[in-house]
Amino acid sequence: MPPKKRGSRIFRKRSSVAQTKAPNLTPPPQAGKATAMQVDTAIIGAGAAGMMCAAHAGARVLVVDHARAAGEKIRISGGGRCNFTNMYCSADNFISANPHFVKSALARYTQWDFVELVDRHNIAWHEKTLGQLFCDVSAKDIIAMLQKLMNKNGAELLLQSTASNFSKHANGFTFDLLSGGKTTKVSTQNLVIATGGKSIPKMGATGLAYDVAAGFDVPVIPTRAGLVPFTFTDGRFAPISGVALPARVSASNTSFEEALLFTHRGLSGPAVLQASSYWQEGAPISLNLAPANDLYEKLRAQRQISGRRNLTKALGHHIPARLVEHLTAELDLAGNLADWSDTRLETLCAYLQDWQLYPSGTEGYRTAEVTLGGIDTNALSSRSMAAKDVPNLYFIGEAVDVTGWLGGYNFQWAWSSAMAAARAIGQKHT
């Protein structure tokens, strides 16, 4: 399916798919008896990547997650409607120490492949903005689709269960599975780690993937919060909390032009979240408060027509009045337009269109949408997501040092990386 024109709205027939739950195919352990289980593939994590992999990884697949329900991050994403991919997804929309790593997986399972899957399951969707595709009805439709595919593949899903004590053996891996108060020793030929990163710990994020990697000597790139609001310890923006405007926010020579929101603790909004993934601690960010126009020329033109007009009122036509009022003392915005020479106006506009700020930090993993860093891609096959030095060990999704922009890119990485691993595993069992 070719890309649609940017900015168009796309609609599909509304979905009537009901949410289903994958069956538990393993009988519960009996008290007092040592139990064991053998599977072809064990997937740790029942999020987007884990479920997608389980649905396509061949027979005898076990999925383990400590959550009460599968796909919890899917459920809450996109305001409950799941921004499941982006029409314009490409390798340029991702951050990684190895920027070429994503190309293979994204090319072999594209955004249009996932759209086709969604269409096959009659899930209604539309483009919201900038190529972002959302469910018309509910994110639960995506979860139901993945669970239906898992059921069809015969995958077993164990929720409120934990995996620990991972070991490598000649024939694969073993780990301890704690489920329903009983411990089972699981043997598996393939082990897939799909537990995500550290973002939003209240949803159950633990960083388990990095612990597993360390246990098998797979290197990990240091992690930090991404797609996250900035904080300022001086509370300077508390008086204008709630003020929003279109702006261009820049960090480390990378700029995003979307909405900016002032908060009690600092800055948020899509433009800020995007820039946060490129920001380095201690470095400045730049705010352009009037990116869509030549502010200097417009103020000069206004001065020529109505020089007695108050400068702050004139600025209020281009920047929210509450923000102008907030800046009045800092920038000495007294007087009428006629009182401001070309030089002073030019200096003022340069300031407003390149406002340099030094964040104290970010809101951290508590509110971060993603985790930057993760499993070092140099240790993985870009074609299969398999660890190069640990046969049959796979890392997929957010656990890997691949972070997408805001707007459906991280879900697409989940689908693409999951399919890369699933296909590699499936080929071994055909």
Each model region followed by its residue ranges:
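Core beta-strand elements of the Rossmann-like FAD/NAD(P) dinucleotide-binding domain
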Residues: 39, 181-190, 256-257
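N-terminal Rossmann-like FAD-binding beta1-loop-alpha1 element of flavoenzymes
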Residues: 41-63, 425
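An anion/pyrophosphate-binding glycine-rich loop and adjacent beta-alpha core
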Residues: 68-70, 75-76, 84-91, 124, ...
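Glycine-rich active-site loop/strand segments that organize a redox cofactor
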Residues: 79-129
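A glycine-rich dinucleotide-binding beta-alpha-beta segment and adjacent secondary-structure elements
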Residues: 159, 326-403
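A conserved short coil-to-beta-strand element within the FAD-binding core of flavoproteins
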Residues: 159-172
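Glycine-rich loop(s) and the adjacent beta-strand/alpha-helix scaffold that form part
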Residues: 190-236
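A conserved FAD-binding loop/helix module that cradles the flavin
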Residues: 199-212, 216, 402-429
